[in-house]
């Protein structure tokens, strides 16, 4: 709350100063015909929008409590705000670039350079104040570190655990750390209940219609209620750095624009020799100087003066293009990082091949598939995986080892769906013991499409598309013998449901 109060005060102060100065720069740029000041005023307008977006994102990001509608809260609001800020800044850069190209074709002489100089100095002071307010958000790489402060957790009950809760029993969760070690607790969810553990997750017996989507969800891990801790607040603060970094880049762009305005005004004031009202003067820098000089020579024999040098007029758009390149160079990393987070790509610090290798090397793990790793915000990295094990008896020890593997890679919010090998099955033959039905197989994250063969292999390879569930359903049906099959002995496969041998898993 303290960090939110500090950021909110800084944003409001900078928003007020930026809006007032934007209005001043728009008026002065129109009066003095200064492209640098006009582009800086447009950038100020972008800053006003960016600060408003940052305020809204900060406000929503404070709502970290999970609800039934937003199970992760609004923690990604700041990432969205950073992306919007980066898009605003990129669009503004292209607008300034087009204006600079137009000034190269039709150069304009600056009017009242001293006024432009004074306004540019004042704008530079305002932007320096903004840089002082947001300097601690200048270059912090988000999500690149491995933070060991945890405390955010939520449990997902398996169907078997919920049934046990309704019957009056207590369904156990994977054993975690002791209550005094709660700040270092990981968020690890398994879809198998350990009925031997008496200190487990309790099933929620509240009626569904009494629960609203905006009500916060109380989370219990190992029977203990997880509260907002200092470590969780530090996670939120790291998640908010991306949004504040976007604000810093806007202020930095304003400072560069103010420097360009000051330099351009100084060079124009000391180097440009313009025409006065009393003298006959020709400006060779404009597109058609011949016509005006011929008319002047025909009308009078007075001495002619020439304005210049012309390179001063091209300094303004040249400096604007340099500013655009600097802004695009500083904005691209922010745009890329926020976009990749929203696209849920694997974080750059996670070596997914090495992670899969370590998981498969764990004793008791036969196969790993459907592994997904993405970044929620800041340093919060989430992973889900299907782990195929030998038997349920050794699974809890395997789950602890898997949790340590994820922890070593900086992943502290994990959901593991266990799969236990059927009798006589091999991982290479049946890679997934809980396969999806054919109508939803292509809608999975990975999409279990049949392998495509080419050439002669396509003619030899039969097309088989059947799931584990459909295979079990077909085997349960009694085979019907036709007349043509009278001489062929029937093979009946009976599947006996052995209760309490394998816990029920929920997809």
UniProtKB/Swiss-Prot annotation:
GO cellular component, one term: dendrite
Residues the record lists as binding Zn(2+): 43, 47, 250, 254
Transmembrane segment boundaries: 11-31, 36-56, 79-99, 114-134, 248-268, 308-328
Cytoplasmic side: 1-10, 57-78, 135-247, 329-507
Lipid bilayer topology: Multi-pass membrane protein
One of the GO biological process terms: in utero embryonic development
Residue ranges, compositional bias (Basic and acidic residues): 204-215
Induction: Slightly by zinc in the intestine, but not the liver.
Cell compartments where the protein resides: Cell membrane; Basolateral cell membrane; Cytoplasmic vesicle membrane; Cytoplasm
Quaternary structure (record): Homodimer. Interacts with TMEM163. Interacts and forms a complex with TMC6 and TMC8; the interaction regulates zinc transport into the ER.
Function, in words: Zinc ion:proton antiporter that could function at the plasma membrane mediating zinc efflux from cells against its electrochemical gradient protecting them from intracellular zinc accumulation and toxicity. Alternatively, could prevent the transport to the plasma membrane of CACNB2, the L-type calcium channels regulatory subunit, through a yet to be defined mechanism. By modulating the expression of these channels at the plasma membrane, could prevent calcium and zinc influx into cells. By the same mechanism, could also prevent L-type calcium channels-mediated heavy metal influx into cells.
Name of the protein: Proton-coupled zinc antiporter SLC30A1
Source species of the chain: Rattus norvegicus (Rat)
Gene this protein is translated from: Slc30a1
């Amino acid at each position: 709350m303290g960090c939110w109060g500090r950021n909110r005060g800084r944003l409001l102060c900078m928003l007020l100063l930026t809006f007032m100065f934007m209005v001043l720069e728009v008026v002065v740029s129109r009066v003095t015909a200064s492209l640098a000041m006009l582009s800086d005023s447009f950038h100020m307008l972008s800053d006003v929008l960016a600060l408003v977006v940052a305020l809204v994102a900060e406000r929503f990001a404070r709502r970290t409590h999970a609800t039934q509608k937003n199970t992760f809260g609004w923690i990604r609001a700041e990432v969205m705000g950073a992306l919007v800020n980066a898009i605003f800044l990129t669009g503004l850069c292209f607008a300034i670039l087009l204006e600079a190209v137009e000034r190269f074709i039709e150069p304009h002489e600056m009017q009242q350079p001293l006024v432009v100089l004074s306004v540019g100095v004042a704008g530079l002071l305002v932007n320096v104040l903004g840089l002082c307010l947001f300097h601690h958000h200048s270059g912090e790489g988000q999500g690149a570190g491995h933070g060991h402060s945890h405390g955010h957790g939520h449990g997902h009950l398996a169907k078997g655990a919920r049934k046990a809760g309704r019957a009056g029993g207590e369904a156990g969760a994977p054993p975690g750390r002791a209550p005094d070690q709660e700040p270092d607790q990981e968020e690890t969810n398994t879809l198998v209940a350990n009925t031997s553990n008496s200190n487990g997750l309790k099933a929620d017996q509240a009626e569904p219609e009494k629960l609203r989507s905006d009500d916060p969800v109380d989370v219990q891990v190992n029977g203990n209620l997880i509260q907002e801790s200092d470590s969780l607040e530090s996670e939120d603060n790291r998640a908010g750095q991306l949004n504040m970094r976007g604000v810093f880049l806007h202020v930095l762009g304003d400072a560069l624009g103010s420097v360009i305005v000051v330099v351009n005004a100084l060079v124009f004031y000391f180097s440009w020799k313009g025409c006065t009202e009393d003298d006959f003067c020709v400006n060779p820098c404009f597109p058609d100087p011949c016509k005006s000089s011929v008319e002047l020579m025909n009308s009078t024999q007075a001495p002619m003066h020439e304005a210049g040098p012309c390179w001063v007029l091209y300094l303004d758009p040249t400096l604007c293009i340099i500013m655009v390149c600097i802004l695009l160079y500083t904005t691209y990393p922010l745009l890329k990082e926020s976009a990749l987070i929203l696209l849920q790509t694997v974080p750059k610090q996670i070596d997914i091949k090495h992670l899969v290798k370590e998981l498969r090397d764990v004793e008791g793990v036969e196969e790993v598939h459907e592994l997904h790793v993405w970044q929620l915000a800041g340093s919060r990295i989430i992973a889900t995986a299907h782990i195929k094990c030998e038997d349920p008896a050794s699974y809890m020890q395997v789950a602890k080892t898997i949790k340590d593997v994820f922890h070593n890679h900086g992943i502290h919010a994990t959901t593991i769906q266990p799969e236990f090998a059927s009798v006589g099955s091999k991982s290479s033959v049946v890679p997934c013991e809980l396969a999806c039905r054919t109508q939803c197989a292509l809608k999975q994250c990975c999409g279990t499409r049949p392998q495509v063969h080419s050439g002669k292999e396509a003619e030899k390879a039969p097309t088989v598309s059947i799931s584990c569930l459909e295979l079990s359903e077909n085997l349960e049906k009694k085979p019907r013998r036709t007349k043509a099959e009278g001489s062929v002995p029937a093979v009946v496969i009976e599947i006996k449901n052995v209760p309490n041998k394998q816990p029920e898993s929920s997809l």
